Amino acid sequence: MSTIVDVFAREVLDSRGNPTVEVEVFLEDGTMGRAIVPSGASTGAHEAVELRDGDSKRYLGKGVLQAVDNVNMIIAPEVIGMDATAQIDIDQLMIDLDNTPNKAKLGANAIMGVSLATARAAATHLAIPLYQYIGGVNAREIPVPMMNILNGGKHADNNVDIQEFMIVPSGAPNFAEGLRMGVEVYHSLKKVLNNKGLGSGVGDEGGFAPNLPSNEAALDLILEAIAAAGYQAGSDINLALDVAATELFKDGKYHLASSGQVLSSSEMVDFYAQMLEKYPLISLEDGLAEDDWDGWKQLTERLGSKIQLVGDDLFVTNSQRLARGIEEGVCNSILIKVNQIGTLSETLNTIEMARRAGYTCVISHRSGETEDSTIADIAVATNAGQIKTGAPARSDRVAKYNQLLRIEEELDVFAVYRGIKAFKR
């Protein structure tokens, strides 16, 4: 009864108004699972390939009809007849069908859609929540949200270098209270910005994107908003950054537009060390460029015992790149984005490898998101303890927060929210 009888893909829109792939998987008993694939703005060079049509006459070249056709014409005939609960077999079949190291033939957006829709169909068939289907009976940790409330870099049209300034309600007793704290600081920040005559327009992920003179000015505004909301920075709420430093890296140097500085890798490490002394930072993501391995090693040796160092573009959810990082002693945490690698099975394998090496895992959205809330379930399924899914605004971000509220309510007394302990430093 859990046999796949049909697979259908279509072109839909993401939160930026760009086309993306939606896949529906139908089972013999009438069950259907649906998944919509997100996309990134600052994408790592080593990510699996997101297939775009390149036809300038449709969606400015960003159409995904080729990926849709790859699902309907190539993948569907092969997976029809398979058992939806055989996730590993289905994912491996698609990897073999593609037969490229980065899923360039069929597209990670095609493969991921089928992979996640299959998992959702199987969970629905078994009449259990998706997080329980993926993670089993021990899936009960609700992640601490890292909420992007102020945007710079590629996520905003302003002069701030750092891409994401996040608040982390690490002092909350549970997820629902942590979310409330984050929402109150978010609205407090809007009021602070308006009072100072600064813009309160939002970036791709719902965070505000005012024109500010420096990265430090952004952090100072957030500290002011935390205090105005009645919370204590450093205990109730901590800060986290996603620098997306690959976007700043040119000709072997880091170019900070806001200050006009051009810094070496070691000077960037000094920059972060000084920032850590001044602000209650507990997580730093993509502090150096995706191929600056020597710089990353310096950063980890100097600050790895003081702060969570997250590799996103560096690792791209890829177990081979993570293995190199573990071997070289680089980072102590990995960002997990399913569409960077393309299948649920490979994602879970990477998480397991990270865990064995003592790395923390942060489950993440993309800047181009949808109403799909699967990553909320994945975060709980894997007991990751941390999630990045934007500001508490815009329905594409709030969909994940609302799903986590439902899961926490469903788990009731069995739900675990570790707060600051999820960061291990």
Curated annotation (Swiss-Prot):
**Source organism per UniProt:** Syntrophomonas wolfei subsp. wolfei (strain DSM 2245B / Goettingen)
Which gene name belongs to this protein?
eno
The note on the cofactor says: Binds a second Mg(2+) ion via substrate during catalysis.
State if Lipoprotein is listed as a keyword: no
Q: Please state what class of enzyme this protein is.
A: lyase
Q: Where does Mg(2+) bind?
A: D242, E285, D312
Active-site positions on this chain: E205 (proton donor), K337 (proton acceptor)
- Function field: Catalyzes the reversible conversion of 2-phosphoglycerate (2-PG) into phosphoenolpyruvate (PEP). It is essential for the degradation of carbohydrates via glycolysis.
The record's listing under PROSITE patterns reads: ENOLASE
Identify the GO cellular component terms for this protein.
cell surface; extracellular region; phosphopyruvate hydratase complex
What catalytic activity is recorded?
(2R)-2-phosphoglycerate = phosphoenolpyruvate + H2O
Q: Where in the cell is it found?
A: Cytoplasm; Secreted; Cell surface
Q: Which family does it belong to?
A: Belongs to the enolase family.
* Swiss-Prot/TrEMBL keywords: Cytoplasm, Glycolysis, Lyase, Magnesium, Metal-binding, Secreted
Tell me the superkingdom of the source: Bacteria
Report the EC number(s), separated by commas if there are several: 4.2.1.11
Where on this chain does (2R)-2-phosphoglycerate bind?
A: Q163, K337, R366, S367, K388
Q: Which GO terms describe its molecular function?
A: magnesium ion binding; phosphopyruvate hydratase activity
Which cofactors, by name?
Mg(2+)
Q: Which NCBIfam families match?
A: eno
Its pathway? Answer: Carbohydrate degradation; glycolysis; pyruvate from D-glyceraldehyde 3-phosphate: step 4/5
Entry's Gene Ontology BP terms:
glycolytic process
Protein's name according to its UniProt entry: Enolase
